[in-house]
UniProtKB/Swiss-Prot annotation:
Descriptive protein name: NAC domain-containing protein 89
Source taxonomy: Eukaryota, Viridiplantae, Streptophyta, Embryophyta, Tracheophyta
Organism: Arabidopsis thaliana
InterPro entries named in the record: NAC-dom, NAC_dom_sf
Signal sequence bounds: none
Function: Transcription factor involved in plant cell division.
Length: 340
């Protein structure tokens, strides 16, 4: 290693060379160490003790050029001393622009504490390509450290430059959940999650369901469930209707006609009238009343039976699978009319 080229002593150069030869050696000082040791010693003129971090006008270079300027070679982070840029003549912002873009401060300046004592501040900046305010964000990040009580204008700062490899053109940096939203929603409907306690995802689902969109979704689910229940009821009514038609056939043969419409007692102990259309009641009653007198023959009887068929086909609540039984019963009644 050319120690003159990098401007460091032989001891420092030997240490840096060892860090590149032996796996596990890494220069990664903490926030407190950067301020309390490196930055303070730099400001006190103790250059030899901090020569591992070079002086560099960061804003004269693009961020992708900075790794080559670092004394300690690394794949993840690089450190530099730099004078904080002067403010613009008529503004409060520091000059942090390069030829191709600018460093934009994000969030508030935060205190750095050593124990309970505040020893400095830390500010985070993100590099954007282009010019404000339409710059395009990149994956280059810089943390700027300053000693407490020092004038901000032209103050010496130490910078930690990093590249966020997980960042991808402004998209989410986190991998998607292993389970889809449909599976998660099913788990919420069935009860608690596998861990037994509500997760952040469950809380998010609850928050969504509490909103207007969630209420609409729940209403649609309730309607679907209600429709399913109606279909089951229709099958049940169809069975009862089939039994009652058979009973009507027996009543015809014995000469006893029913005077009451059959009823159904629901699970809630409420009495409900079966959904027999009025047209069917009238046509069937007419046939039963006219059958003993045998006044209608031939064409008239055929018309009556035809109207009864039309009425039967108008019953929407009867399951299609039961039509074979109903048609058979009506055919039997028709045969009785013609045989007698």
């Amino acid at each position: 290693m050319d120690t003159k080229a990098v401007g460091v002593s032989k001891d420092t150069a030997a240490s840096m060379e060892a860090s590149t030869v032996f796996p596990g050696f890494k220069f990664s000082p903490t926030d407190v160490e950067l301020i309390s040791y490196y930055l303070k010693r730099k400001m006190d003129g103790l250059e030899r003790s901090v020569e591992v971090i070079p002086d560099l006008e960061i804003y004269n270079f693009e961020p992708w050029d900075l790794p080559d300027k670092s004394i300690v070679k690394s794949d993840s982070e690089w450190f530099f001393f730099c004078a904080r840029g002067k403010k613009y003549p008529h503004g409060s912002q520091n000059r942090r622009a390069t030829k191709m873009g600018y460093w934009k401060a994000t969030g508030k300046e935060r205190d750095v504490k050593s124990g309970s004592e505040v020893i400095g501040t830390k500010r985070t900046l993100v590099f954007h390509i282009g010019r404000a305010p339409k710059g395009e964000r990149t994956d280059w990040i810089m943390h700027e450290y300053c000693v407490k009580g020092v004038s901000l204008d032209d103050a010496m700062v130490v910078c930690r430059v990093r590249r966020n490899k997980e960042y991808n053109s402004g998209t989410s940096q986190k991998a998607p959940k292993p389970n889809s939203s449909a599976e998660k929603h099913a788990k919420v409907q069935n009860g608690a999650t596998s861990s037994g306690s509500p997760s952040d995802w469950d809380n998010l689902v609850d928050f969504y369901l509490a909103g207007e969109s969630g209420e609409k979704l729940l209403a649609e689910m309730a309607e679907s469930s209600e429709n399913l229940q109606v279909d089951n009821d229709e099958d049940f009514f169809a069975d009862i209707l089939r039994d009652e038609i058979i009973n009507l056939d027996e009543a015809v043969m014995t000469g006893n006609t029913p005077n009451e419409v059959p009823t159904l007692e629901s699970a809630s102990m409420e009495i409900r009238v079966l959904p027999l259309p009025n047209m069917i009641d009238k046509q069937m009653s007419s046939l039963l009343e006219e059958r003993p007198s045998q006044k209608k023959k031939g064409k008239d009887a055929t018309e009556s039976l035809s109207s009864c068929f039309v009425g039967l086909y108008s019953i929407k609540s009867v399951n299609k699978a039961r039509w074979d039984v109903i048609i058979g019963v009506v055919a039997l009644i028709a045969m009785l009319f013609y045989l007698e």
